[in-house]
């Protein structure tokens, strides 16, 4: 799992207004067994998001999959159905954000409202190739 330094804590703090724009938020308790950082509840779907500092915000999706491999594995244990989504939010030291939906087999770039970006393809981390869900 990636470390939780001061930059990661700043990313969580800065994520709160973004999350509040999407609905009510509930922060997860800290600790070694924490799976996600916050939940967003409004209409379906409920969002479980993990917020991370990104040393290379412009990295390709395959590079991000490799860098956040342990975090993605942790997020994939969350039970999923049509009523929830799992997201990874990353923030650069300059405040640039990128958002991703985590599926059982792929990472898909989304906007801050949770909508898939039309021009972006997904990346399957089970096969290591573009595509997936």
List the model feature ranges, each with a label.
Residues 1-14:
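Solvent-exposed, charged helical/coil patches
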Residues 14-27, 39-50:
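Active-site beta-strand-loop-beta-strand hairpin of nuclease catalytic cores
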Residues 28-29, 77:
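Short, flexible, glycine/charge-rich loop motifs used to bind or transfer phosphoryl groups or to couple energy/partner
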Residues 37-39, 88:
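Short beta-strand scaffold segments in enzyme catalytic cores
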Residues 44, 50-65:
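Short beta-strand-loop-alpha-helix junction that forms the active-site gateway
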Residues 80-133:
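Domain-level recognition of nuclease-like catalytic cores that cleave nucleotide substrates
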């Amino acid at each position: 799992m990636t470390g939780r330094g001061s930059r990661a804590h700043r990313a969580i703090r800065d994520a709160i207004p973004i999350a509040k724009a999407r609905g009510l938020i509930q922060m997860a308790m800290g600790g070694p067994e924490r799976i996600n950082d916050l939940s967003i509840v409004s209409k379906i779907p409920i969002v479980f998001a993990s917020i991370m500092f990104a040393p290379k915000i412009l990295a390709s999706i395959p590079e991000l999959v490799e860098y956040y491999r342990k975090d993605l594995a942790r997020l994939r244990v969350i039970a999923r159905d049509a009523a929830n989504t799992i997201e990874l939010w990353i923030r650069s030291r300059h405040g640039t954000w990128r958002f991703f939906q985590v599926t059982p087999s792929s990472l898909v770039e989304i906007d801050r409202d949770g909508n898939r970006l039309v021009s972006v393809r997904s990346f399957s981390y089970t096969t290591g190739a573009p595509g997936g869900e």
